[in-house]
């Protein structure tokens, strides 16, 4: 219907936790206020949508009782009604999980978190499965596949550009969400992984920007999550 549905985390400072919301954007750039569609008693963040067998699914990061893991939901009535299916990969604390299909396998890229759920943003972990709905995800033998605070943590969906596979990565050096980079995936198999940095982006292209968090592009629409410095009196 010529509209974009932007899935995002809203953080409620009064509750000290996040919930998931949707902004609807039309082709003229008009957008709605965020509409909450998923909230729990604990923190939710980083929604990632994927399609499997003509059905939409959503994974998101969760921090509950100091544990960080992934939850899987199935869409029952797009875009606001989603049904919980199961937890994924509960034995390793993970944040910012990103689903990707490649060479007949499903892959989850996620940053390893500390036991208290606070990510160091330094280690990128990789898991694979033949079925994205499975609770059997195999850790890659090279984990962590990236150990670098400047690009390890996922910063949005993996995408194709100019016949290359691009993985956005967060730069969390000095501060969380300092910027992001485009990293080309060179090898992605059950036994191999290799990537190289293509370009890094800093929050220097607009006055007031102090951080870049995520990058997503789909069907001609690009969404960048930024942080700005504002006066509380404005």
Which residues are covered by each model-predicted region?
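Carbohydrate-active catalytic/glycan-binding domains of CAZyme proteins
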Residues: 1-234
């Amino acid at each position: 219907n010529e509209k974009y549905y932007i899935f995002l985390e809203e953080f409620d400072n009064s509750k000290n936790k996040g919930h998931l919301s949707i902004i609807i954007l039309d082709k003229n750039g008009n957008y709605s206020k965020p509409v909450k569609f998923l909230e729990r008693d604990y923190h939710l963040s980083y929604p990632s949508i994927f399609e499997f067998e003509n059905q939409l699914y959503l994974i998101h990061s969760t921090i509950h009782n100091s544990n960080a893991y992934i939850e899987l939901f199935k869409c029952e009535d797009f875009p606001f009604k989603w049904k919980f299916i199961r937890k994924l990969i509960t034995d390793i604390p993970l944040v910012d999980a990103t689903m990707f299909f490649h060479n007949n396998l499903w892959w989850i890229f996620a940053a390893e978190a500390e036991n208290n759920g606070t990510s160091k943003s330094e280690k990128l972990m990789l898991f694979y499965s033949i079925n994205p709905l499975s609770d059997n995800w195999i850790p890659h033998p090279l984990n962590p596949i990236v150990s670098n605070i400047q690009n390890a943590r996922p910063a949005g969906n993996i995408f194709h550009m100019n016949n290359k596979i691009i993985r956005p990565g967060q730069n969390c050096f000095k501060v969380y969400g300092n910027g992001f980079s485009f990293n080309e995936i060179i090898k992605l198999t059950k036994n191999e992984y290799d990537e190289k940095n293509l370009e890094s982006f800093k929050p220097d292209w607009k006055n007031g920007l102090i951080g870049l968090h995520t990058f997503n592009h789909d069907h001609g629409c690009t969404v960048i999550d930024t942080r700005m410095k504002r006066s509380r009196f404005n």
